[in-house]
Amino acid sequence: MLLASGVNFGFRLTVPHMLGISSGFLVMAFAVGLGLAEVFSRLPWIYGVLKWAGAIYMLYLAWCIANSAPPDDVLPVGQPAARPAMPLGFWGAAAFQWVNPKAWVMAISGFSTYVPATSGLMIVAGAAVLFAAINLPCVSVWALCGARLRNVLRMRRNLILFNYGMAVLLVISLYPLLRAY
């Protein structure tokens, strides 16, 4: 998603998306550290609901990526611009972490691997901040690569094909998640 956002909107307009991912993950990781993972182990159907809600939202995002209009600077002269798409903003990206199954897996596995279950509030908070601090440069690389690809994808046809490809890959990424159901 960040690669596609970097291509379609550039690095600067993708920054709120990146910050939203890291902030949303910080809050979610903190909640996991405080015991939310225990809720999932006792009520596994909640994780299933989140998994399916996340999958539906990811399908919607794939549709948005596939149908996003190329930026005006890619359109041929004289062709009217389509209604411009907007990148996912801070709050949307932060909220998406709560239905993003991959983020849940990272938060739960991070805490279960690196943080003792009997840790106090300060250790849990410190671990959540550390996980989010590691997350930000990692997601930034995807957006930066997308911004660099933007120069290569100047032709409208290439950008449209790229967006379709990213949408298909996003849909394919759901297979490992949903094959258990």
Each model region followed by its residue ranges:
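Hydrophobic alpha-helical transmembrane segments in multi-pass integral membrane proteins
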Residues: 29-33, 99-108, 168-181
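Short loop-to-helix capping motifs
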Residues: 10, 100-101, 155-156
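Selective transmembrane alpha-helices of multi-pass membrane proteins
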Residues: 42-73, 135-142, 152-181
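Juxtamembrane transmembrane-helix termini in multi-pass membrane transport proteins
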Residues: 1-48, 106-132, 143-144
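Flexible cytoplasmic inter-helical loops of multi-pass small-molecule transporters
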Residues: 67-85
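Residue-level signature of transmembrane alpha-helical cores of multipass secondary-active transporters
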Residues: 21, 89, 93-97, 131-135
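Alpha-helical membrane-protein architecture signal
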Residues: 12, 83-95, 122-126
